[in-house]
């Protein structure tokens, strides 16, 4: 990994993503899909100190928006500043392509933010589980985690019991990176949309755990799923869980 970030190369990466097609949806122009915007109604400087609202489904407006975004990217003074221009669903995609040009510190900080900003990062169709592992394994844990998280991470036992809740929607995503130290958290994921699913318990050696995140009260650990052992279904506690919410 690079000792220093090559900011010029990171900007080139961002500009390449900026040049990709804006994909319309049934709700366009209000909702579109693109690494730098999720709405087709955007504001750009009008050259008079104000802003102008434009429709990105129109070719001329789209060109002007791309030019405006390119100027912002060019003015950015850090890789993190560029990363923050990318919308959440594409955060890990940006990191995947920018990673060869990032220092270990910058990569770790962006990875931590991208992971915790995303609703279901391990289900990102643009980034595979193996690619995510190639991000987490070389990351600097002191940059990846907050101080309190790092302290908790260091105190984990040599072998750790972890839990994961899945629903019919993600029933095949058992051996994946994201697990919890807390069974109640896994239960919450099973029932949060009124669904019934399954909670799994497994063991994993600490050396195959790469991060601990306490945000959103999830007690989340990032693991190499190939080293999970003794994966078993936990006794169905759904009725007890639902009663506890009344």
Regions found by a protein language model. Give the residues of each.
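Conserved NAD+-utilizing ADP-ribose enzyme module
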Residues: 1-162, 167-177, 183-246
């Amino acid at each position: 990994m690079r000792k220093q970030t090559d900011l010029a190369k990171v900007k080139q990466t961002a500009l390449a993503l900026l040049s990709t097609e804006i994909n319309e949806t049934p709700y366009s122009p209000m909702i579109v899909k693109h690494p730098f915007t999720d709405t087709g109604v955007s504001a750009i400087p009008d050259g008079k100190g104000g802003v102008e609202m434009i429709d990105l489904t129109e070719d001329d407006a789209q060109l002007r928006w791309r030019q405006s975004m390119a100027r912002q990217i060019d003015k950015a003074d850090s890789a993190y500043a560029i990363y923050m221009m990318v919308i959440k669903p594409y955060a890990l995609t940006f990191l995947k392509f920018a990673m060869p040009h990032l220092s270990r510190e910058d990569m770790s900080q962006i990875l931590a933010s991208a992971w915790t900003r995303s609703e279901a990062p391990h289900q990102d169709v643009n980034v595979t589980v193996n690619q995510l592992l190639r991000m987490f394994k070389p990351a600097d844990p002191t940059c990846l985690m907050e101080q309190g998280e790092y302290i908790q991470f260091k105190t984990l036992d040599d072998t750790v019991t972890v839990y994961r809740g899945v629903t019919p929607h993600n029933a095949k995503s058992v051996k994946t990176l994201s697990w919890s130290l807390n069974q109640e958290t896994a239960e919450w994921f099973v029932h949060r949309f009124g669904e019934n699913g399954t909670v799994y318990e497994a063991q994993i050696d600490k050396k195959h755990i790469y991060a601990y995140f306490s945000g959103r009260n999830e007690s989340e650990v990032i693991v190499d799923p190939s080293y999970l052992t003794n994966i078993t279904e936990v006794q169905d506690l759904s009725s007890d869980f639902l009663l506890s919410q009344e």
